[in-house]
């Protein structure tokens, strides 16, 4: 591993490799200019790129940075994208829309990277869009060490699309799972119109498992529904905390007992809702990198 270095804007995850920063400057008209000052000739480069908060800008920054690294003579480039944007747009729901997940995946694949690492894609079928190897990691494996389960614990999927993820979590926790029914507006994609539940959950501890919290509306309605049906406690575990708009206030307005998220997206402490616990994906990432770069 002595021939491996990490480059990034900031050293968020404190990985067990030498870290060297990327310098990003902008011209007066806003054009991006990355600069790689360090020596990368013949080295295995790990490029850690957060795609938050403006993924459209950061994707261009990614492309230019990868090109700069290749031009300096790196032996290989492994790109780490803890949260992969645009994957929610994996289908064309209405004529006139783009299949954005496929387009972005192809752009990233052809940027010059040799491998991509990411966590908990919203839709695993999007893996087929990439044309370079993708190491798809899951932060769900940390769940058993974070929550205590008993005979009255259930795992809840907030919608049908998240059911496979909730099922994996239920297997890890050795607990049954239920699925909430959800309808979403095609016009305002983040707006949940209704939820329904067909299981008896009175007196249970519910653990809602999802990959993303964006506006918080889905989770807030799910928490309220579960409490209205008699759940004694509701814990939410979500990998990617986007927390857009009024998500903090929306979640704080519910009777949620605990929110657990990871640092695939990093916020300041005051940006998180009350009762939030943030866990780091650094150990999982470090282990995966050492295995894949060996």
Enumerate the language-model features and the residues they cover.
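PRPP-associated nucleotide enzymes
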Residues: 1-294
């Amino acid at each position: 591993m002595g021939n491996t270095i990490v480059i990034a804007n900031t050293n968020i995850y404190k990985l067990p490799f030498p870290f060297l920063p990327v310098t990003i400057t902008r011209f007066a008209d806003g054009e991006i200019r990355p600069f790689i000052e360090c020596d990368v000739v013949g080295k295995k480069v790990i490029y850690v790129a957060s795609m938050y908060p403006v993924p459209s800008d950061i994707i261009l920054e990614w492309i230019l940075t990868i090109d700069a690294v290749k031009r300096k003579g790196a032996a290989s480039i492994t790109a780490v994208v803890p949260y992969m944007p645009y994957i929610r747009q994996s289908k064309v729901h209405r004529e006139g829309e783009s299949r954005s997940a496929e387009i972005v995946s192809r752009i990233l694949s052809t940027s010059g990277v040799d491998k991509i690492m990411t966590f908990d894609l919203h839709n695993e079928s999007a893996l087929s869009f990439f044309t370079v190897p993708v190491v798809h990691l899951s932060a769900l494996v940390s769940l058993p060490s974070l929550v205590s389960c008993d005979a009255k614990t259930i795992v809840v999927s907030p919608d049908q699309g998240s059911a496979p993820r909730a099922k994996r979590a239920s297997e890890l926790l050795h607990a049954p799972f239920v699925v909430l029914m959800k309808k979403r507006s095609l016009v305002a994609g983040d707006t949940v119109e209704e939820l329904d539940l067909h299981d008896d959950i009175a007196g249970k501890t519910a653990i809602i498992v999802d990959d993303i919290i964006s506006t918080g509306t889905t989770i807030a309605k799910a928490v309220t529904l579960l409490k209205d049906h008699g759940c004694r406690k509701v814990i939410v575990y979500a990998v990617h905390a986007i927390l857009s708009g009024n998500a903090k206030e929306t979640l704080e307005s519910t009777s949620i007992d605990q929110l657990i998220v990871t640092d695939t997206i990093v916020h300041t402490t005051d940006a998180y809702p009350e009762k939030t616990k943030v866990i780091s994906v650094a150990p999982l990432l470090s282990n995966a990198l050492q295995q894949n770069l060996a």
